[in-house]
A protein has these predicted regions:
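Alpha-helix N-cap/helix-start capping motif
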Residues: 8, 39, 62, 113-114, ...
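Nucleotide phosphate-binding site architecture
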Residues: 11, 43, 55, 117, ...
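Short, flexible helix/strand-to-coil boundary loops that buttress conserved ligand/catalytic motifs
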Residues: 14-15, 49, 120
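Active-site neighborhoods of divalent-metal-dependent phosphate/nucleic-acid chemistry enzymes
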Residues: 73-108
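Acidic, PIN/NYN-like endoribonuclease modules and their adjacent C-terminal/linker elements
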Residues: 102-110, 114-136
Length: 136
């Protein structure tokens, strides 16, 4: 299975490894699915990892963040979303996430974002709990 994992799930999973988002990240690390990201999503993950509150919670420094982003570049499938039209009516900042799903033709977008979840009737979008039920 190929899945786009939204930034909110990814960061939550790093911060709370025993939570449902943490289990989504663990399932990727264990090879249960292929993680799909795009360059804009990688940039967003990097920006969020650099928030002082997140850095403190994870106890990560610049080197740890840099290494983690490099690992993501090599381990995730990076999809080019240029030219992909995506529109999230309630939050245009989510357009890049939906564009990643559409451009990659992934099996699922895993998110906790209500603006994206409202589009689940039109696209393969699910919550972390629903995703875990699908892969296990």
């Amino acid at each position: 299975m190929r899945a786009v994992v939204d930034t909110n799930v990814f960061i939550s999973g790093l911060m709370l490894p025993h939570s449902t988002p943490g289990k989504v990240i663990a399932a990727w690390r264990e090879g249960h699915y292929q993680l799909i990201l795009s360059e804009p999503m990688l940039s967003e993950i990097g920006a969020v990892l650099n928030y002082p509150k997140i850095r403190k919670r994870l106890a990560w420094n610049d080197l740890t963040i840099s290494r983690s982003l490099t690992l993501l570049r090599f381990e995730a499938e990076i999809t080019d979303i240029q030219g992909t039209q995506a529109h999230v009516p309630r939050d245009s900042k989510d357009n890049m996430v939906l564009a990643t799903l559409l451009a990659s033709e992934a099996d699922c977008l895993v998110t906790g974002d209500l603006d994206l979840l409202t589009l689940a009737e039109l696209h393969p979008i699910c919550t972390p709990t629903e995703f875990l039920l699908r892969i296990f």
